[in-house]
Structure formats: structure tokens, C-alpha cells
Amino acid sequence: MHPRDQTIFALSSGRPPSAIAVVRVSGAQAGLVLTTLAGKLPAPRQASRRLLRDGTGQPIDDAVVLWFPGPASATGEDVAEFHAHGGRAVLAALLAAISVIPNMRAAEPGEFTRRAFENGKLDLTEAEGLDDLIHADTDRQRRQALRQLQGLLGNRARDWRERIIEASALIEAGIDFSDEGDVPAELRAPAVKAIKALHVEITEVLAAQGHSERLRDGMVVAIAGEPNVGKSTLMNQLARRDVAIVSPHAGTTRDVIEVQLDLDGYPVTVIDTAGIRETDDPVEQEGVRRARARAEDADLVLWLVEGEQAADPASMRSLWTSGDGSHPSGGSVWIVRNKIDLGEFGDEGPQGEFGISASRGDGIRELVDALVKFSAEFFGTSEGALVTRARQRDLLRQASDSLRRSLELVGEGEELAAEELRSAAYALGRLLGRVDVEDVLGAIFQKFCIGK
């Protein structure tokens, strides 16, 4: 029996113990599972309280069951759900009772969602939105993922694809007239108009995305500087907990330490790095190497100095493996003066420099406010973004390029223009997951948890 013909089951809720646990079953045997464990089938889409029994008649649990006959279900197949008590022993007995029923097997990661995709319940962009929603850590990530799940990009892509196919039909119909002379204007003109409009729409979407793809992974901020200037103390202040060891001894931080922050809904990864200095200690040398590598990839570097100490350009240049002290990948660098409680310095100094006391917390609120403002500018207009993944951007760019080439060719050779339109429609079909996407399905659905 093909794996997709088997009925699958899995725990779909969180790890036990819990108050309630949900076990989901999908496939042709879902109804049999319900009747075997709970007696007769309940009314579709209505909760029913049942005493669950295993194959020998032994009671398992007093639970709520639901029945969703396909295709009107989440996966498009027959689906059964058991809402049982979330104790480990209860779930072990329930899953064991299901597993011994013929043609049953445990679901693989993301398999319920993959079956929903294969049965037309959602397209690939919506599946990606679901994946993002499951992994969202901040409210802005949640809102962006939910819009994708609700079809923000998928609906537009379907409309574009249908219009491309209509324009292609006009062009190809004109080819039939080629033996009799030029393609009739009543066929070419509306096709060209439609192609121009489509090209403009897709190009505008690509141009307006800003850092929307980055909202999924977040912005990276590296705290860097010479040893023992308070980098780890600042890290703990930003995290509001002790995540880094603080010591008066220089070189305490040997490895890169990361913490995930939610700054007004913006996902930010803050990195505490080893102090930048020349050293003979091989372990510290490796820490410095890693610090430089992560700082070079950061979107923003907070270069920490002590009080009124000048920000030594040579020290800052030493942070990068090459260059003149500016960020090698175009990121921003802020000077943050620590230990202002030991000298005269305001909350914010010249040229956007910040004054803080990491040990007392002075100036931290102002620094965080500046980070929130920087995050808003960095992520830009990602609130209504259509494109949230590199895969989506690449396929939209392919479609846009094909539309542009079709416009260039439509007056020279209708066959070539029609071929470019087919390429554009094909790219959008891949975007939606409707053509030739087997190579990406595994990569997407394997990231889902088991039971989803």
C-alpha cells in the first residue's frame, strides 16, 4: 500500500502532561478508528462525549470526539479527533489502541498539512504562512504569517496566472492567422495591454518588499568592543535576565552568546561577543574570530566604550577582517558609552552616541527606544508585504522577467512571446505549488512538527 493511501495519526497538541490533548487521525480508516474506540460515529462536526475503549474492551479515557467526513475537512480526507485528558499514560494507551488497527501508521512531520496541500485545501504560499505562524515569536511575525495563511500572496498569484493564461491564449490564437498575414490588432492589442499591466503589478510588488523576508528571521544586533567594557552586562540589561557571565576579569566571554528579543513586535537577535584584542590564548583567539565573523554579518553593531574614552578608530577597524572601520556589509555602527555613572556624560552624546550605565540601568530605556525606531526603519513596510520568502521572490522575479521578454518579442515573433508567457505562468504555478514542486515540498513540510 502506498504511504499516502494509509491512514495517519499523531498527537497534535503539546507535549504531555497537559489538561487536554488532541489526537488527530486522517485517511480512509478514520471512521473505523472512531467506531472501534468510541462506538458509533458522532454527527459530523459536532463534539460528542464518549468512553474510549481499546480493542479488548478495556476503558482508556472519558473523552470528547469529533468526526469530519471528507472532503469537508482540514486535510480533504476523513478526519477524526480525540480530545482526551493529557496524561502520559492516557495518551500512551490511546495511541497504542489506534496503532494496532489495520493500515494505520504514525504521521511524519507536516504530513497532515501536506495532505491538505495535495488535496487542494491550501496552496504552497499558504502552507508557508502556516509554518511561519507556528514559529512566530512576535506579534508582527504572527500578523505577517496569518496574512500569508489567509492567501494574501496566493490569491494575487492565482489572479496573475489566470490573466497570463488569457493573454497567452490571445497571442496563440493570433498565431493561427500568421499564414494569412499579420496578427489581427483586435488580438494583439488587448494581449499587450494585459501583459504590460501584469508586468507593472508584479514589478511593483517586488520593489516594495523592503526587509519583509527578514521579519521571519529577525534583525541581528551585535554588542562589540574591547574586553571588560560591560558588553555582557548590557546584554543582560537588554534581555532583562542573566544570560551572560559578568566578571571584572577581561576575556571572560569566550564564545558568542545570543538572545532573542521582542522589541515592539520586531524580532531582534542580540549577540554578546568576545572582547576584541590581541591575545596568545587559543581559546580566546577563537572567541575573537567568531566575534568578528558575527559582527560582520550583523545589521547593527553597538560598539561599547568606557565613559569619556574616545572610540578608537584602530580598535573599531580591528573588528572587521578588512576595511576602513565602516561596516563591511553596509550595516550600521553605534557608539555606546558605558559607565557614565563614573563621569560626566548625558543620556545621548554627539553624533547619535548613547550614554548608559549597564550596571545601574541608566540610559537603557533610551537605547531600547532607539533600537525600536531603528527596527521600524529596517523592516520598513513589511506589515502588508506579499513576499516573505526568498523562494517566493525568486519565482516572482522569474515571472516578471518572462513578461518583460514577452513584451519585447510580441512584435517580432508571436511564438517566442507565447513561450515567455508560458514560462511566466509556470513560475507562478511553482509559486502556488501546482506544478513541478516536488523538490521543495520535503524541505517545507519536514520543518513542521509531527501532528501538523
Swiss-Prot record:
Its EC number is 3.6.-.-. NCBIfam families: mnmE_trmE_thdF, PRK05291.1-3, small_GTP. Binds 1 potassium ion per subunit. This is tRNA modification GTPase MnmE. Its main location: cytoplasm. Homodimer. Heterotetramer of two MnmE and two MnmG subunits. Its cofactor is K(+). PROSITE patterns: G_TRME. Mg(2+) binds at S232, T253. SUPFAM superfamilies: P-loop containing nucleoside triphosphate hydrolases, TrmE connector domain. (6S)-5-formyl-5,6,7,8-tetrahydrofolate binds at R24, E81, K121, K452. GO terms for biological process: tRNA methylation; tRNA wobble uridine modification. GO terms for molecular function: GTP binding; GTPase activity; metal ion binding. GTP binds at residues 228-233, 247-253, 272-275. PANTHER family: TRNA MODIFICATION GTPASE GTPBP3 (PTHR42714), TRNA MODIFICATION GTPASE GTPBP3, MITOCHONDRIAL (PTHR42714:SF2). Residues 218-376 form the TrmE-type G domain. GO terms for cellular component: cytoplasm. Keywords: Cytoplasm, GTP-binding, Hydrolase, Magnesium, Metal-binding, Nucleotide-binding, Potassium, tRNA processing.
